[in-house]
Curated annotation (Swiss-Prot):
Stretches for region Disordered: 33-53
Organism: Malacoplasma penetrans (Mycoplasma penetrans)
Keyword Signal tagged: yes
The protein, known as: Lipoprotein p35
Predominant location category: membrane
GO CC, one annotated term: plasma membrane
Sorted UniProt keywords: Cell membrane, Lipoprotein, Membrane, Palmitate, Signal
Family in the record: Belongs to the p35 lipoprotein family.
Subcellular location: Cell membrane
Membrane topology listed for this record: Lipid-anchor
Pfam families hit by this protein: MpPF1
Signal peptide range in chain numbering: 1-30
UniProt PTM comment: The N-terminus is blocked.
InterPro entries registered for this protein in UniProt: Lipoprotein_p35
């Protein structure tokens, strides 16, 4: 399963590293115009002059699989200048045709000025009930974050969440993996149509259930890196000077990457023997971010993810170093590696070791 730059969700149609498979050949056609000069007095005696005008035919890839920032497919602005998911995909097609066409290099010079349209069948949000600011503020709402143990979700639009999260039993399984959302006698789980919110790389959804005879309302926060926009049969139309008018179709998948911006973490001061303060695992255990059995330390991945705002990564302790000006402060450094199937926003999936925070000891 990303500080964060994403604001309130309005009409959401959620629609990098590149892995694309196709076998469509490069196609270039030539149009000839011929003029004959018959005895025009210039001594050329009836030579023919041919002017070649090249027209490139776009050859779409059958599968387009991309990874990148949420902003590539969703505009967080709410004003009249907000761009739709279709418009954002068009911008990417023009900027990076090699990701969409087998002859992308040949298209670079002509597609930038071409007319390109995209039809993914995107629909307006049906989450039109109570606004998030209303339902989430109620005193009895339970809050929790989608577990790293839960699967990524393929959606065609945000409305798919009401089906891809599954039936009552499936949603119960998701909630049972989240300590704050686990109910003793939970039944009748469902996703409501109340308003969504997108903030700090988390998409907030209202889930209701019954705990015995008691109605329960929950704020389920799903990291956006758990969402893949998957459109089978994405339609792309292209026309313009130097490019053959074409109506094309591809299977499109966009894996939303992990934003590696880290929240400022300032845990409360704890007591730990000075000799143990340079042991990062012992420090994490003392702070409540790890457990220990014998000599084996296990980091609480979900708890660290929530604390750091960095989701769908495996964290490992690297080091704990004393501050040069304060003997009671230590900088704890972690390594974060995207889980299988996840990537950073830049499309890479290698470990990042600059994840750190300051621990204070008393």
């Amino acid at each position: 399963m990303k500080i964060k730059k994403i604001k309130l969700l309005k009409a959401l149609a959620l629609t990098g590293a590149f892995g694309i498979v196709a076998t469509v050949p490069v196609i270039v056609s030539s149009c000839s115009s011929t003029s004959e000069n018959n005895g025009n007095g210039n001594g050329n005696g009836g030579t023919d002059g041919n002017t070649q005008q090249t027209e490139v035919t776009p050859a779409i890839k059958s599968e387009v699989s991309l990874t990148g920032a949420l902003s590539k497919i969703y505009d967080t602005k709410t004003g009249t200048d907000r761009e739709t998911t279709s418009q954002l995909i068009v911008k990417d097609i023009k900027a990076n045709p090699e990701n969409y066409f087998t002859n992308g290099e040949a298209l670079k010079d002509v597609i930038a000025s071409a007319t390109v349209t995209v039809d993914g069948g995107f629909t307006e949000s049906t989450f039109t009930g109570e606004a998030y600011s209303v339902w989430s503020a109620k005193a009895d709402v339970k809050k929790g974050t989608y577990s790293q143990a839960s699967k990524q979700l393929d959606i065609k639009s945000i409305n798919d969440l009401q089906t891809v999260l599954g039936d009552s039993a499936a949603i119960k399984g998701i909630c049972d993996l989240i300590p704050n959302l686990k109910l003793n006698n939970g039944t009748d789980y469902k996703v409501t149509n109340n308003g969504l919110s997108l903030s700090e790389d988390l998409l907030h959804i209202n889930v209701t259930a019954k705990d015995g005879q008691t109605d329960v309302s929950m704020d389920l926060a799903i990291p956006v890196s758990d969402l893949n926009l998957k459109i089978d049969g994405l339609k792309i139309s292209v026309s313009g000077t130097g490019i053959k008018t074409s109506e094309l179709t591809t299977n499109y998948k966009f894996n939303i990457g992990i934003d590696n911006t880290v929240k400022t973490l300032t845990p409360a001061a704890v007591t730990l023997a000075e000799a143990d303060r340079t042991n990062a695992e012992k420090v994490l255990e003392k702070l409540g971010y790890a457990t220990v059995s014998g000599s084996t330390y296990t980091l609480d991945q979900d708890k660290l993810a929530d604390a750091l705002g960095l989701y769908n990564c495996k964290f490992e302790a690297v080091k704990s170093e004393k501050d040069s000006t304060n003997n009671n402060k230590y900088t704890v450094t972690l390594k974060a590696t995207p889980n299988d199937g996840y990537f950073w926003e830049d499309g890479t999936n290698g470990a990042k070791e600059e994840i750190s925070f300051v621990a204070t000891f008393s």
